[in-house]
């Protein structure tokens, strides 16, 4: 992984299943057994959690606005990509929870949707978003001065704390929203992904954070498309069940729309990962080339 710096210087699925819900039409009726999971796990909670997240996703009012970059006067998509690539690197080196990263980028894009930011403050905004996300997600997190250090001391603690206040005020303290990794973790349990399969999906999921244009897709669609890519890559049979999960009412038109969204999102993700393999933004690829992530980024180099 790269060092810190200031960015202002420019197989078949197990056929055994467990019935877990009284609703016969629910895809959540079928959760595949996994020897690695606690067999006493009550799968009914998966359905409740998933649909509660889906409900929150549809009802949330303050969220990133696709197209916000057109209103920014001093920053652009490439600057955001460099910032996010750097934040992924910092997040890994700080050894933070996966949720912390996704929430930080959600806060970043939401703030940038409503606030004009000069380029000399963009890195400050980014590291402050990670700082805020740490406070919510982490039991123990780096000291304030460590967040300053990773910017090569471009800013000071007072500036960080003032930016924290400004972001929280602008977002009216609404910093929580369903994020892709929450949906994906449930899908991985439903379809019994092993470590290799799970990490391949995460590789695509973290890659999507870099591309500003992926904001047009909801968190649940991003998660479904990552699971779709995994299931197609490993030739898993039940990928079509992904089209049903977001449609609780078994509406054919809705399922068709969801299917189209998943396929388009997956297409863009594959294109993005291919381009990242050839770009200077190496944080995600380097991270997922490590053995702890099953070296999954190497799968995509010639695929």
Which positions does each model-derived feature cover?
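Acidic, serine/threonine-rich low-complexity regulatory regions at protein termini
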Residues: 1-303
């Amino acid at each position: 992984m790269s060092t810190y710096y200031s960015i202002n210087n420019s197989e078949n699925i197990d056929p055994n299943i467990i019935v877990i819900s009284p609703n016969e039409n629910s895809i959540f009726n079928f959760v595949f057994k996994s020897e690695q999971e606690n067999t006493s796990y009550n799968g009914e909670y998966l359905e409740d959690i998933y649909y509660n997240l889906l409900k929150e996703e549809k009802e949330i009012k303050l969220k990133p606005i696709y197209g916000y970059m057109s209103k920014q006067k001093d920053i652009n998509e490439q600057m955001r990509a460099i910032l996010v690539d750097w934040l992924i690197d910092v997040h890994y080196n700080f050894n933070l929870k996966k949720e912390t990263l996704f929430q930080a980028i959600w806060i970043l894009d939401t703030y940038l949707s409503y606030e004009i930011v000069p380029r000399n403050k963009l890195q400050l905004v980014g590291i402050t978003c990670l700082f805020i996300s740490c406070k919510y997600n982490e039991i123990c997190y780096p000291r304030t001065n460590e967040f300053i250090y990773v910017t090569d001391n471009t800013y000071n603690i007072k500036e960080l704390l003032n930016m924290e206040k400004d972001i929280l005020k602008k977002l009216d303290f609404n910093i929580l929203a369903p994020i892709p990794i929450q949906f994906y973790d449930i899908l991985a349990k439903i379809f019994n992904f092993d470590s290799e399969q799970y990490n391949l999906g995460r590789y695509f999921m973290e890659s999507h954070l870099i591309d500003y244009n992926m904001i047009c897709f909801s968190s649940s669609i991003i998660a479904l498309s990552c699971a779709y890519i995994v299931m197609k890559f490993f030739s898993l049979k039940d990928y079509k069940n992904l089209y049903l999960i977001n449609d609780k009412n078994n509406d054919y038109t809705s399922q068709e729309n969801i299917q189209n969204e998943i396929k388009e999102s997956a297409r863009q993700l594959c294109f993005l990962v291919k381009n990242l393999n050839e770009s200077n933004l190496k944080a995600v690829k380097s991270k997922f080339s490590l053995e702890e992530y099953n070296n999954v980024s190497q799968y995509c180099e010639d695929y």
